[in-house]
Amino acid sequence: IIRTRIGRGYYTQRDLTCAPISKCSYLQRATLPNETAFYGCISDSNKQLEYGRIIGLYECSKLARSETECIGRQYVTASQWKILQPLKCISFINDKTFPRTNDLSKQIRFIIEAYKKANLTTVQKELGNFLTTEFCKQVRPNHNHEYLITATIIHDMLYANEYNYDAVLYPSVPVEGRFGINIVIKPDIVKNKLSLYRVINQSYFKSEIESLLRIDGGYDNKGHLLSAEKQDADEKICKKLGIRSLKELPIIK
């Protein structure tokens, strides 16, 4: 599992699991106000780190999701997690999940094929279509109230006694179902069934003509430096971005 957090200087499992409840005062797609959870993603196995970094960036970074005329640079931390025990999951994905996306991730295509083979009633299919539409909905900035249905459904799946799932799978809206699948996990499950494996420092650069996500180094789960070598030198990044200096890009926090 890949989890992303904006900023750097985070090296421990405590830094990289769930946001403090004090910072969770508003609705999100998968959590109600004053609730916290572990947001992450599972990506296609042959390009797990690369694809997971892309999903995490677009889920977390307003700069990445903004229009092309917005420029800047941003520090981004990605963490890799090992699954120590199987997770009891439920997904909200069916054949109505981003039907216009031709290159849906392998995980989503697998779930869709399983859905097609399921013996469902008309009512079950209609309910599934409604929920799928909600989980694929683009929500405008400052309209978090539109997350009420998905956040409530996920809360019930995780905490209601008749369900009590460990985690919920749903598509990433910013990348429209490509590269992998999102997962939200209960905090106590993270403590018991997941383990921090590696931390990756990154820099995201966005000019008027191009954007790039660079690996700046990595750490093990004890905070020990594995590599301080940057994926690309600053001069090479500037050339790709069509700028003379990285200082032309304001730092976005």
Go through each PLM region and give its residues.
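Short active-site loop/helix that positions an aromatic residue
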Residues: R53-A64
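Short, well-ordered beta-strand elements within core beta-sheets of diverse protein domains
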Residues: T36-K47
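Active-site and NAD+-binding cores of ADP-ribose-processing enzymes
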Residues: I1-T31, S66-K253
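DNA-binding interface regions
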Residues: L32-P33, Y51-I54
